[in-house]
Amino acid sequence: MSFGVLCFLGLALLSAPSAAEKNGAYYQSLQKRLIADGFDAAAIRELYARPEVKFETKGISVYFVHRESKVHYERYTDQLHIEKARVYLQQHRAAFADAENVYGVDPEVITAIILVETQLGTMLGSRSVLNTLSTMASLSDPKVRNLLWRKIKNTPDLTRAVFDKKATQKSKWAYRELMAFLRHARSQGFDPAEIKGSFAGAMGIAQFMPSNIDTLGKDGNKDGKINLFDDADAIASIAFYLKEHGWQPGIERNKAAKVIYHYNHSNEYVDAILSVTERLKG
């Protein structure tokens, strides 16, 4: 068990008091909610007292101005990306074959998703999932919202009305995701403060949100754990996700588009996935 995990389970760090004081104004009410919802009080206090657990002002401001239309998905259909995707297909052919046999999902569409989500597992995100979800979840507290607004109010294209609406909506969602993340960390035995992910808290090669892992994550390499940073687990998990949302062998393109839309609610994203899939099959 790593030193970080031991800290999460309750060992105090020498730097904890200063970190706790720094995060106190932001995470005090959040910690109370987590404890009230059944998390161990000592473990939660120790976790949020660690110096690497911070309120992510910069990261959260990116979230508030993100627009899908600004993501250039078309680049993934160029020859360089397609060739890399074909290499990935070959490298993990056994895992793809297993996923296709069990779930009936084409290896090419799984590869397309991994290509677009994480560039075939090479870009997994650099933001702390714990910090991201904790920051968003804490925005249910009006005092915390005001503190954050004062720091990011000069962000381009962001008004107070838009900020308040989005903060209120997403704080509830983020709290559910945070609880799922902490439970997953506990069940799988990893340190929640060490996991990196996207600006919204998605994690692993498959870029699953934490709430999807326990219900849709699969142990592709049969090692007894669900680790979405492992290629075989990610491949099996994506296959199961698509199957659960309606994917079938030989599915028509319009129906495939509806299934993929569940993975990311963006028409541009869906078009890119289908285009890459078709090129890989061609």
PLM feature segments, named:
Residues 1-4, 8-201, 205-207, 211-282:
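Cell-wall glycan-active module
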